[in-house]
From Swiss-Prot:
Taxonomic lineage of the native organism: Bacteria, Bacillati, Mycoplasmatota, Mycoplasmoidales, Metamycoplasmataceae
Protein name per the record: Lon protease
Active site: 714, 757
Keywords per UniProt: ATP-binding, Cytoplasm, Hydrolase, Nucleotide-binding, Protease, Serine protease, Stress response
Any one Gene Ontology BP term: protein quality control for misfolded or incompletely synthesized proteins
Subunit structure: Homohexamer. Organized in a ring with a central cavity.
Species of origin: Mycoplasma mobile (strain ATCC 43663 / 163K / NCTC 11711)
Inducers of expression: By heat shock.
Domain Lon N-terminal as annotated: residue spans: 3-198
Length: 833
C-alpha cells in the first residue's frame, strides 16, 4: 500500500493515541497537503534516526518502522508553519520511497507490521505485576487523562500503548519499545524502565543519607538554594519585608511622602498577595508592583538653590557664550525666588527631612476637592520645558548637566534616538510578562526625587511603527497643563511631573513634530565661529585635555594663531567635538615624545608642529573652487549639522525637445525652485537681454555631492543667477554667495538659518552675500567677525542682484574676482519687530 509520509523528529505516536506536531519543512507541508487532498487525511509518520538533522536523504536517515495516522485537525500558525493533531491507526514497515506528481519524495510503499499478541497470558502477568508493585510510580509520572484511561482499559494492548505513549522517556528508549515485535517485549521494556524510575526516586528520597557527597556542584547549589528558601520562610524574612513596607508607609515622613491613593493601592495589593501562592507568577508580579510603588519618591523633592550669583558662576564655568539659555535659567530661578517671597505660606507645606538635602512637598499630588479625580497644581509651580536645538558638538548635553548643577538637582539622561514603541514612554501594562514602567517613571525612580532635571536626548530621532507613536506619548509628558496627571500604564496611578525640569535636545527642529514643537520653548545653539572656538579651546578644552593626559601647561603651549590653524585645517564642523579630538591627539603625541625623552621641557605647538604631529592637512582655504566659471554660483544651505555652501552648476546643449534636466538628488521643493527660476528667466529674457533659443536647447542644472539629498526653497536666487550666467556666458565671482527664495515675479522671499549660512560663507572665504531684505533683522545674530569680513547686500527683487552682478548689457558691467562690488549701506538697517 502507498501513503504520503512525513519524517518526524523526537515524536513517537502509538496506536489509538494522539500527538500534536508543529510542521515547517517544505516536504512535510507537501505531504500534509497530499494526505488531505488524495488520501482521506491518512499520513504516515516515520521517525528520523538523528533528530538534530534538518535535511534528510530518506532511507538511510529514517527508521524502517513507523505508524499510519489520521489527521484530526490542521491549524496555520502566524509564522507560516502548521500545527497538526494526528491519531495512530496501524504500525507499518517502510519498504521504499517514490516521488509524487510534483517530483517530491513523499510517497511511501508500506507493509503492515502488526504487534504480536501472546496467547499464553504473559502480557496480563506483567501488567498485574506493574499494578501491584509500581502503581504509585505509574500514577505520579502520568498526566490525569492517562491515569483515567488506564483505569478503564479494555485490553492489555491498550494498557501498553497508553503507558508507552504518555511516559516521559528518552526518544531512543521510546522508539525501542515502539519497534518491538510482540506486546510482551514492549511490556518488559516498560516494566524495566519503571523499576529504574522507582530506584531513581528512592535515591532522591534517601539523598542526604546515601549520595550527598557525590552530588555535583550544580545539584548541591540547587539543594542549598531550596533549603535556604525554607529557612528564610521559617525565620519570617517575608514578614520582615512586609514590616519594612509598613514601617515606611506609617513613619512620620512616609505618611506625608505617599499620597492617600498610593497607600490605599499598596494595602489592597498586599491583601491580594496574601491570598496567592508565593511561588506563583502572579505573586511575583504583585510583589514587584508593590516595590515600585514604595520606591518611587512621590512628594520627595530636592531643595533648590536660590543664589543667583553662584548660579551664574556655575553656568559660566561650564560654557562660553550661550547667553540666551543662561538668561532663561536665571529667569526661572528669579521667578522661583520671587514666588517664595510672595507666597511664604507655600513654605509651610514643605517638610525638611533631617540630615539630608531633601524635603516633602505637600503641594504635589494634591486634589482641590476630595471628589476630584485628578491632581491640581498652582501656576507658580510651572517649570519651563526647554528644547536645545543645534548642530552636533555645540554643548547641548553638557549644558543640561550644568543646569542641573546650578539648581542642585539630580540629573538623569533618557536617550530617545531610535525609540519606536509608545510603551517605552508610558510603560507596559502589568498583564504582560516582564512588564516595567516607561522611561519617564524609571528615570524618576533612579533620581529618587520628583523634581530632577531630565534630559530627553535626540527627541527629533524618535519614530513610529505598528507598536505606536512615542511622539504622541511625549505630548502628555511635555505639556504643563497635562503632565501634572501623567499616567504610566504599569503604575496605573497618576504621577505629577509638574516639578520635573525637562530639557530636550535636537539637531534640527524641522524634524520635530508640530504638536511637540508647540509644547516646548526652543533655544537655538548655533555653530561656533573660529574666534569662539579658540576661546572655548583656551578656557575649557585644553584644560580638560591636559588633565586627561597628565601634561603640564609648559608641555602644551599653543598660541591663538596655531589654534586657528588647527581649527581651519583639521576640523570642519559646527561644534567643537573634532577640535577636542584633535587637541587630544596632539596631547597623546606629546606624551609619547616625553616618554621617549624627545621633548624639551617647554614645548611650543606651532603650525609646523601640528602638521608634523597630525599629518597632512585635511582641509585647505581653497578646498572649493577658487576661480570664476560661467554657470557656477555659490549658494548657502542650512542643515542639521550647521551651515554649508552649495555650489550650483548650469550648462546648456542642443536638444530639440528643450526643457530642463535636474541632477544631484534634489527633492520636490528644490526641484520646483529650479523650475520657478527657469520660468522667471524665460519670461524676462528680453528684459535681461538674453539671446537664447529655449526650444532648441536643453538646460541642465546640477548640484554637486549627488549622494546627499537636498531640499528647500532658499536656493531660488542661486538657481536664477546660475541660469542667467550660463545663458549670457558671463561668469560670477567665486567670492560671491547668495540665499533667498524667488517667486515667478522675481520677488526675493526671506529664509531661515542666516547665522549658520553666514558662518559657512565665512569659512569658505566668500566676501559678498546677497540676502533677502526681510532678513536684515537677523544680522544682529551674526557674529561681528563674520560681518567684518563679509559684505551683506539685502535685496527685495531679483533685478537688484542682476544689476550688481551683470550690470546693464549696454555697458557690459559685471562683477569679477578682481573688481569691487558696489556696497549698499545696511549698517542703518534696524531689526523689525
Amino acid at each position: 500500500m502507498k501513503y504520503p509520509f512525513m519524517a518526524t523528529r523526537g515524536v513517537i505516536t502509538f496506536i489509538g493515541n494522539s500527538s500534536t506536531i508543529e510542521v515547517g519543512r517544505p516536504l512535510s507541508l507537501a505531504a500534509i497537503d497530499l494526505a488531505k487532498s488524495d488520501f482521506e487525511n491518512k499520513l504516515v509518520l516515520i521517525p528520523q534516526k538523528n533528530i538534530k538533522q534538518n535535511e534528510i536523504e530518506f532511507e538511510k536517515d529514517l527508521e524502517n518502522v513507523g505508524i499510519l495516522t489520521k489527521i484530526k485537525s490542521i491549524k496555520i500558525l502566524s509564522n507560516g508553519n502548521r500545527k497538526i493533531i494526528v491519531e495512530g491507526v496501524e504500525r507499518i514497515k517502510l519498504d521504499s520511497i517514490e516521488k509524487d506528481k510534483n517530483n517530491n519524495d513523499i510517497i511511501a510503499n508500506l507493509s503492515l507490521y502488526p504487534v504480536l499478541k501472546n496467547e499464553n497470558g504473559s502480557s496480563e502477568t506483567i501488567i498485574e505485576k506493574m499494578q501491584t508493585s509500581l502503581n504509585n510510580i505509574i500514577e505520579s509520572n502520568l498526566p490525569l487523562v492517562a491515569n483515567q484511561e488506564l483505569s478503564k482499559h479494555e485490553s492489555s494492548e491498550r494498557y501498553t500503548y497508553i503507558l508507552a505513549h504518555y511516559l516521559t522517556m528518552p526518544f531512543e528508549k521510546k522508539f525501542e519499545i515502539f519497534a518491538k515485535k510482540s506486546l510482551t517485549e514492549m511490556l518488559e521494556l516498560i516494566f524495566s524502565f519503571l523499576v529504574e524510575l522507582k530506584n531513581i526516586q528512592k535515591l532522591d528520597v534517601d539523598l542526604d543519607k546515601d549520595i550527598k557527597k557525590n552530588l555535583d556542584s550544580q545539584q548541591r547549589e540547587y539543594l542549598l538554594r531550596e533549603r535556604l528558601k525554607v529557612i528564610q520562610k521559617k525565620l519570617g524574612d517575608d514578614e520582615n519585608d512586609e514590616e519594612e513596607i509598613e514601617e515606611k508607609l506609617n513613619s512620620k515622613y512616609g505618611k506625608e511622602q505617599y499620597p492617600e491613593e498610593v497607600i490605599k493601592t499598596i494595602k489592597n495589593e498586599k491583601r491580594r498577595l496574601k491570598n496567592m501562592m508565593s511561588s506563583s507568577p502572579e505573586a511575583n508580579t504583585s510583589r514587584t508592583y508593590i516595590e515600585w510603588l514604595t520606591n518611587l519618591p512621590w512628594r520627595k523633592v530636592s531643595v533648590d538653590k536660590t543664589n543667583l550669583v553662584k548660579s551664574k558662576e556655575i553656568l559660566d564655568s561650564y560654557h562660553y557664550g550661550l547667553k540666551e539659555v543662561k538668561e532663561r535659567i536665571i529667569e526661572f530661578l528669579a521667578v522661583m525666588i520671587n514666588n517664595n517671597k510672595k507666597h511664604p505660606e507655600d513654605e509651610k507645606t514643605k517638610i525638611q527631612i533631617p540630615n539630608s538635602d531633601y524635603e516633602i512637598n505637600k503641594n504635589l499630588f494634591t486634589k482641590k476637592n476630595a471628589s476630584d479625580d485628578t491632581y491640581s497644581y498652582k501656576s507658580s509651580n510651572n517649570v519651563p520645558i526647554l528644547a536645545l536645538v543645534g548642530p552636533p558638538g555645540t554643548g547641548k548635553t553638557s549644558l543640561a548637566k550644568a543646569i542641573a548643577e546650578t539648581l542642585d538637582r539630580k540629573f538623569i539622561k533618557i536617550s530617545l534616538g531610535g525609540v519606536k514603541d509608545e510603551a517605552e514612554i508610558r510603560g507596559h501594562r502589568r498583564t504582560y510578562v516582564g512588564a516595567l514602567p516607561g522611561k519617564i517613571i524609571q528615570a524618576i525612580k533612579k533620581a529618587g526625587v520628583s523634581n530632577p532635571v531630565i534630559l530627553l536626548d535626540e527627541i527629533d530621532k524618535m519614530s513610529s511603527d505598528y507598536k505606536g507613536d512615542p511622539t504622541s506619548a511625549m505630548l502628555e509628558v511635555l505639556d504643563p497643563e497635562q503632565n501634572v496627571n501623567f499616567q504610566d500604564h504599569y503604575i496605573e496611578l497618576e504621577y505629577d511631573l509638574s516639578k520635573v525640569l525637562f530639557i530636550a535636545t535636537a539637531n534640527y527642529y524641522q524634524n520635530i513634530s508640530a504638536p511637540l514643537l508647540d509644547r516646548v520653548e526652543i533655544i537655538e545653539l548655533s555653530s561656533y565661529t573660529s574666534l569662539e572656538k579658540i576661546r572655548i579651546a583656551r578656557d575649557y578644552l585644553i584644560k580638560k585635555v591636559l588633565e586627561q593626559n597628565s601634561l603640564e601647561e609648559s608641555q602644551f603651549k599653543i598660541s591663538d594663531e596655531s589654534l586657528d590653524f588647527l581649527i581651519k585645517h583639521y576640523t570642519l564642523e559646527a561644534g567643537v567635538r573634532n577640535l577636542q579630538r584633535a587637541l587630544d591627539k596632539l596631547a597623546r603625541k606629546i606624551v609619547v615624545k616625553s616618554l621617549e625623552n624627545k621633548l624639551e621641557k617647554d614645548f611650543v605647538i606651532t603650525s609646523e608642529e601640528i602638521v608634523n604631529l597630525l599629518g597632512v592637512i585635511k582641509y585647505t582655504d581653497d578646498f572649493k573652487e577658487n576661480y570664476e566659471r560661467i554657470g557656477a554660483v555659490n549658494g548657502l544651505a542650512y542643515t542639521q549639522y550647521g551651515g554649508s555652501t552649495l555650489s550650483i552648476e548650469v550648462t546648456t546643449f542642443p536638444n530639440s525637445k528643450g526643457g530642463i534636466k535636474l541632477t544631484g538628488q534634489l527633492k520636490e521643493v528644490m526641484q520646483e525652485s529650479a523650475q520657478i527660476a527657469l520660468a522667471f528667466v524665460r519670461s524676462n529674457a528680453k528684459k535681461y537681454e538674453i539671446d537664447f533659443n529655449f526650444e532648441a536647447n536643453q538646460i541642465h542644472i546640477h548640484v554637486p555631492e549627488g549622494a546627499v539629498p537636498k531640499d528647500g526653497p532658499s536656493a531660488g536666487v542661486t538657481f536664477t543667477t546660475a541660469i542667467i550666467s550660463a545663458l549670457k556666458q558671463i561668469p560670477v565671482s567665486h567670492k560671491v554667495g547668495m540665499t533667498g527664495e524667488i517667486t515667478l515675479r522675481g520677488k526675493v522671499l526671506p529664509i531661515g538659518g542666516l547665522k549658520e549660512k553666514s558662518l559657512a560663507a565665512h569659512k569658505l572665504g566668500i566676501k559678498t552675500v546677497f540676502i533677502p531684505n526681510e532678513n536684515n533683522r537677523n544680522l544682529v545674530e551674526v557674529a561681528d567677525e563674520v560681518k567684518e569680513s563679509i559684505e551683506f547686500i539685502s535685496v527685495s527683487d531679483y533685478d537688484e542682484i542682476f544689476e550688481n552682478l551683470f550690470g546693464k548689457l549696454s555697458d557690459n558691467k559685471k562683477i569679477t574676482s578682481n573688481s569691487k562690488i558696489p556696497k549698499k549701506d545696511i549698517s542703518k538697517a534696524n531689526p523689525t519687530h
